[in-house]
Regions:
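Helix-loop-helix "hairpin" substructures at the membrane interface of multi-pass membrane proteins
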Residues: 137-210
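Cytosolic-side transmembrane-helix boundaries in multi-pass membrane proteins
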Residues: 8, 248-283
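Membrane-interfacial amphipathic/re-entrant helices at transmembrane-helix boundaries
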Residues: 1-28, 276, 282
Length: 283
């Protein structure tokens, strides 16, 4: 009975319940969009856009503008700007990400240093804070999750073509630039609604690790789209619970749990591959 009481103790607190709901939905959402991040070789995009959104969050705090409105517009504009610069091919996509996001992050730091009263809220954005999660965050992450699911379901074929063969997609009358812009906008919105719990410094890991783990379990694109969200949601759920009982940062615990899952899947996949190679050697 004591163990059961301790196990369910955090559920007595409203802030924990809010954080658990937001993080679990966010884990599934990041897992879903992370599939495209991994397959498109855009692992750096999550890291970059999280830094860009930080600039918007800092500006919103300083100007006392609604967080979702200010940081959301900033993040989406940054994503679209990256896509536009990259399409011109004057510089590569990685360079475009570096220029736009580091400039935005630097602006955020400058604002934070100039207006010290905003430092506490900015620190929460950087590292995440389950205490700052409100009911409004639940609505926000649920809305973005619904939009993300709608984009994937309605644009499944276009996303599939543009992800695996950009040239074939263009020949097939798929507006690749529009698809990429929508995807970047969705990633920006996902980062925005997830920052409260995970923080900007670790959000990119939540976009990459669950999808990378899922990628080692299947070669099917359709299976990836449900395996990755499951991994993301489960690790966020248990990570939140562990963080309370271990008295550790929620974001750090979630990412460490994701990393453990990745290591386990990697070890199992490696063992299976060696077994297959050994069986072929006996033929």
């Amino acid at each position: 009975m004591i163990f059961a009481f301790d196990l369910f103790e955090p559920y007595e607190f409203q802030f924990f319940r809010n954080g658990l709901i937001v993080s679990t939905i966010a884990g599934a959402l990041c897992g879903l969009l992370g599939v495209f991040v991994i397959l498109r070789g855009m692992s750096y995009i999550g890291h970059g856009l999280s830094h860009a959104v930080f600039g918007g969050a800092a500006a919103s705090a300083v100007m006392k503008v609604n967080y979702f409105l200010g940081a959301g517009i900033w993040g989406v504009v940054s994503g679209l700007l990256i896509a536009r610069v990259a399409r011109r091919r004057v510089i590569g996509a990685d360079a475009a990400i570096g220029v736009v996001t580091t400039a935005s992050f630097a602006l955020g730091l400058a604002l934070m240093n100039r207006y010290g009263q905003a430092s506490k809220s900015i620190e929460a954005v950087l590292f995440g804070s389950v205490l700052g999660v409100k009911v409004a965050d639940i609505y926000a992450v649920s809305l973005v999750a619904f939009l993300g699911l709608a984009v994937v379901v309605l644009g499944y074929r276009k996303l599939l073509f543009s992800t695996f063969d950009r040239d074939v997609a263009q020949v097939s009358n798929v507006r690749v630039s529009l698809v990429e812009a929508v995807l970047l906008a969705m990633i920006s919105l996902t980062i925005l609604v997830t920052m409260r719990v995970i923080g900007t410094l670790l959000i990119s890991a939540l976009l990459v690790i669950p999808a990378a783990s899922a990628r080692m379990t299947t070669n099917s694109f359709s299976r990836l789209l449900w395996v990755s969200p499951i991994i993301g949601a489960v690790t966020c759920f248990f990570g939140m619970n562990l963080s309370y009982h271990l008295d550790t940062s929620a974001s750090a615990t979630i990412i460490l749990l994701d990393a453990i899952v990745f290591i386990i899947v990697y070890a199992i996949a490696g063992t299976r591959n060696r077994a297959k190679m050994a069986s072929l050697g006996h033929l």
